[in-house]
Amino acid sequence: MARDLKDCRVPCKLLLEDLQALCRRKKLVCKQLSVTKNNFNDYEVEYLCNYKKHKGREFFLVKWKGYEESENTWEPLKNLKCPILLHQFRKDMKAALLQANEPLDSASLSGPIISFLRQKATQRIRLKKWEDLMNQTCWHKGRIFVSNEVDMDGPPKNFTYINENKLGKGVDMNAVIVGCECEDCVSQPVDGCCPGLLKFRRAYNESRRVKVMPGVPIYECNSKCRCGPDCANRVVQRGIQYDLCIFKTDNGRGWGVRTLQRINKNSFVMEYLGEIITTDEAEQRGVLYDKQGVTYLFDLDYVDDVYTIDAAHYGNISHFVNHSCDPNLQVYNVFIDNLDERLPRIALFAKRGIKAGEELTFDYKMTVDPVDAESTKMDLDFSRAGIEGSPIKRVHMECKCGVRNCRKYLF
């Protein structure tokens, strides 16, 4: 039994830095955490929560990591070796003083200002822990950052970050049983590679950018293929390649997502992930979501309207991407390790070049040219595929995208 358990791993309930603080507080030596008798008294600033000036000297009330607030201490500026926390505290303090119309050179802070600074500091800690958790959970290269400079909202409740779709009750997915025999799917494709076997042409160029029209299905190489993981026909399965930031919008659209790196036109950005459920189940959930004024239901009606992706409680960063009537992302149906046309994977590609710092959006009510749809054996219902695409939506939702050609309503 001991031999079988030797290489087992279990999730840790605390972050390593929290465990380090706990060991120091309890005076426990732990070599694995680099806690020794020599650094028992190394204290780490968790956040700054008050400020005062006395005889020209600045003092900050410090909340120490791993210690209760009752053990907070006032420290002179020279004792603090946390420039990032100091910069953020001064920025928050200035904003709060301006908002309250109080002097910026105040020698002490009023109760409401102190309360705001404490709330803001603890909010940032919660958001940072959520950010760390998502980055520990995700499999992809691109990092996730979180920012909220608008209000006091913390991480969303009842949301679990996932790396692949979660199958709901009554949903079965059959694994692919055949793959291509190509050694080089670009220069020496055998029988047209995976797309050719299904009478389609390859969707990507040598730079892994999509080259087919929206509405044309994408068939990537799969786990049964002879080619390796660096094959140019493996794109969506490689996951997010760009650093992205979940941020709070300042115009009532809730959370949004912006890119921190430039994204070239036709590049893969992210996959829309969630819980795959039956249309009947989606109908029931849709009634509840309508009452809440939210929508995370994405119909998979490439050929038949049988299944829906619900990203309300399980999803990835796409959960936070907002709608726009003039979006910079385009939806494509992708097939990899499952070829059931009722269960495509939903991939979002850049419609144009996207600058660093720009918000990412897609059209919840996207359309496909009927000519293109017909030419690719696609059911014309795909013109309604997406978050809008079924009778689940029973109420009008106001659009707040703000673009010139805004349709005023999402649905």
Swiss-Prot record:
Q: Where is the signal peptide?
A: none
Residue span(s) of domain Chromo: 43-101
Q: Name one GO cellular component term.
A: chromosome, centromeric region
GO terms (BP aspect)? cell differentiation; exocrine pancreas development; methylation; retina morphogenesis in camera-type eye
Residues that bind Zn(2+) 2, according to the entry? C180, C194, C221, C225
Q: Which residues bind Zn(2+) 3?
A: C185, C221, C227, C231
Domain Post-SET, first and last residues per copy: 395-411
Q: State if Transferase is listed as a keyword.
A: yes
Q: Which SMART domains match?
A: CHROMO, PreSET, SET
Major subcellular location class: nucleus
State where the protein is found: Nucleus; Chromosome, Centromere
Q: What does this protein do?
A: Histone methyltransferase that specifically trimethylates 'Lys-9' of histone H3 using monomethylated H3 'Lys-9' as substrate. H3 'Lys-9' trimethylation represents a specific tag for epigenetic transcriptional repression by recruiting HP1 (CBX1, CBX3 and/or CBX5) proteins to methylated histones. Mainly functions in heterochromatin regions, thereby playing a central role in the establishment of constitutive heterochromatin at pericentric and telomere regions. H3 'Lys-9' trimethylation is also required to direct DNA methylation at pericentric repeats.
Give the domain section of the comments: Although the SET domain contains the active site of enzymatic activity, both pre-SET and post-SET domains are required for methyltransferase activity. The SET domain also participates in stable binding to heterochromatin.
PANTHER family reported in the protein's UniProt record: HISTONE-LYSINE N-METHYLTRANSFERASE SUV39H (PTHR46223), HISTONE-LYSINE N-METHYLTRANSFERASE-RELATED (PTHR46223:SF4)
What name is this protein filed under?
A: Histone-lysine N-methyltransferase SUV39H1-A
Organism, by scientific name, is Danio rerio (Zebrafish)
| Protein encoded by which gene | suv39h1a
